[in-house]
Every structure is written in structure tokens, then in C-alpha cells.
């Protein structure tokens, strides 16, 4: 018996592959992190089979390389994601995102009275991990929120 293994999303020659994104989160990452703000080709795989997650999303961006800081910000939404840098169709660097200390300009503060919602300032949160949970503290209103509360509003 032979197995024909085919890529479900076309390989890229050079660029970034964000893999192991939880299903239904891929589009949110594209929007929040402004990954579509490029003229380069972007390929998206949604609800792909995954041995580890059951189902996953996948994003491939040609000729763009995410920085370590950008990759780490993805950990807020996709803690198990991997960010692979591709050159000549080969993985030349693999980043495993870790929670950053701060995240700026991506999330929206859930506090409706926070100035970041009405003034022309970039949102800014400090990120804390406590008892296995992630908490985000807004720089402006100084309120602390569980990760899910912030992610729902963003």
C-alpha cells in the first residue's frame, strides 16, 4: 500500500509560514496583525487536519519574514503556533513564539471608559502569566483583564 502525501497548501520558495494556528483563528491573526498589508502573495489554509490540534489554520506569506517580536505577539492568540522562515523551499529558521512582556497597537482595551478607545493613541498592554492564566494590564486605564476578555473585544 502506498501513501500519496500532498501538501494541502502550496509550498512557498521564500517567506514565512505560520503553522499550528488553532482552527478559526487564522483570519483574526491576518486582520489584527495587519499581515495583509503587503503586495506579496498570501496563502491561507483553514480547518486543515492536524495530529496535534485536530484541526488547524495555516498562513504562508511570500517574501516577508516576521521578526521575533512579531512572532511573539502571535502567542497571545496562538500559543502553540510555529513561525517558519523559508528560503529555497527549506526551513532556515524556526521560531517558537513566547508570550511577550508587552503588546502594543494590536488589541483593544475592554474598558469602555479607557482613553485608548476614544483618543488617537495605540493600545498598550503589559502581559503577565499567573497560575497558568494570561492577564493583560492596560497602560492607560491600568485595569487588568484575563486574556479571553481582551481577545473577545479585539
From Swiss-Prot:
Gene3D superfamilies: Aspartate carbamoyltransferase regulatory subunit, C-terminal domain, Aspartate carbamoyltransferase regulatory subunit, N-terminal domain. GO terms for molecular function: metal ion binding. GO terms for biological process: 'de novo' pyrimidine nucleobase biosynthetic process; pyrimidine nucleotide biosynthetic process. It holds the Pfam family PyrI_C. InterPro entries: Asp_carbamoyltransf_reg_N, Asp_carbamoylTrfase_reg, Asp_carbamoyltrfase_reg_C, Asp_carbatrfase_reg_C_sf, Asp_carbatrfase_reg_N_sf. Keywords: Metal-binding, Pyrimidine biosynthesis, Zinc. The keyword Iron does not apply. Zn(2+) binds at residues 109, 114, 138, 141. Binds 1 zinc ion per subunit. One of its GO terms (cellular component) is aspartate carbamoyltransferase complex. The keyword ATP-binding does not apply. Its cofactor is Zn(2+). Contains catalytic and regulatory chains. PANTHER family: ASPARTATE CARBAMOYLTRANSFERASE REGULATORY CHAIN (PTHR35805:SF1). Involved in allosteric regulation of aspartate carbamoyltransferase. Belongs to the PyrI family. This is Aspartate carbamoyltransferase regulatory chain. The gene is pyrI.
Amino acid at each position: 500500500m502506498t501513501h500519496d502525501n500532498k501538501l494541502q497548501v502550496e509550498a512557498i520558495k521564500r517567506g514565512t509560514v505560520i503553522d499550528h494556528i488553532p482552527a478559526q483563528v487564522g483570519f483574526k491573526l491576518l486582520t489584527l496583525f495587519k499581515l495583509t498589508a503587503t503586495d506579496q502573495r498570501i496563502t491561507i489554509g483553514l480547518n486543515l487536519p492536524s495530529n496535534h490540534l485536530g484541526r488547524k489554520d495555516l498562513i504562508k506569506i511570500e517574501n516577508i519574514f516576521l521578526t521575533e517580536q512579531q512572532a511573539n505577539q502571535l502567542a497571545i492568540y496562538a500559543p502553540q503556533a510555529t513561525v517558519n522562515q523559508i528560503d529555497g523551499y527549506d526551513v532556515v529558521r524556526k521560531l517558537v513564539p513566547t508570550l511577550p512582556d508587552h503588546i502594543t497597537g494590536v488589541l483593544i482595551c475592554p474598558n469602555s471608559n479607557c482613553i485608548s478607545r476614544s483618543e488617537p493613541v495605540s493600545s498598550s498592554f503589559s502581559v503577565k502569566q499567573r497560575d497558568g492564566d494570561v492577564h493583560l494590564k492596560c497602560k492607560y486605564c491600568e485595569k487588568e483583564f484575563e486574556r479571553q476578555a481582551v481577545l473577545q473585544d479585539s
